[in-house]
Amino acid sequence: FDILGILIERAAGMPFADFLRTRIFEPLRMRDTAFFVPKDKRSRLAIGSNNPAREVPTRTPSVIHAAGGLYSTVDDYLQFARMLLGRGQLEKTRIISHRSLDYMTSNYLTPEQRQQSFFGIKKFWHGEGFGLGVAVKDDLAVNSPVMGVGSPGTFGWPGVSGVWWAVDPREDMIQIFMVQGGDNEAPRRAFQERAYQAIAD
């Protein structure tokens, strides 16, 4: 992802953080998403119990990692997820083409690659594959490592310290789970399962 960030900078002729701000965050009205937290918003920052002393930048860092480092809110995440659920468009604002979204949410792992360990977890890709930056669920019967339960075609990805999101186009559903610190797998799976149980057939 960091290499992709450099390529974006060169193609766009602007810093990666500025590209995200002008091409994605501002058009989607994501007012609280950036690689830093301004001083006047620090009181709203949730600090993880596993790393309470972590330094949080108050301005754009000199080195940006495209692989991570954004701070955001549930409301902003929802705007982004609504755009993805809208096949690249939110209301009258198009961010990516529907064809690009189809590429993004297709699996590109071979059966052999899916058998490999990932993050030290065996069968990490059991029941799901990997697209362009997102996990993609393809087996309804498997409670898969990243996506958990969900319809085939559900896609999303976890973040640091417990953030997790998913878009299920088949059920027209967005799930956003935000906690800070600790192991979130059990409560996140319970959150998911109850959401699906609430859907009337």
Question: Residue ranges of each PLM-predicted region?
Answer:
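A generic secondary-structure signal marking the coil-to-beta-strand transition
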Residues: 130-132, 153, 163, 171-173
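Hydrophobic alpha-helical segments
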Residues: 2, 78, 169, 189-192
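Short, small/polar residue-rich loop motifs at catalytic or cofactor-binding pockets
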Residues: 159-161
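Short, surface-exposed loop or secondary-structure junction motifs
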Residues: 1-152
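Short, well-ordered beta-strand elements
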Residues: 165-167, 171-181
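Short acidic, gly/pro-rich beta-turn/loop elements at beta-sheet edges
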Residues: 114, 144, 177, 186-187
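Generic C-terminus detector
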Residues: 179-201
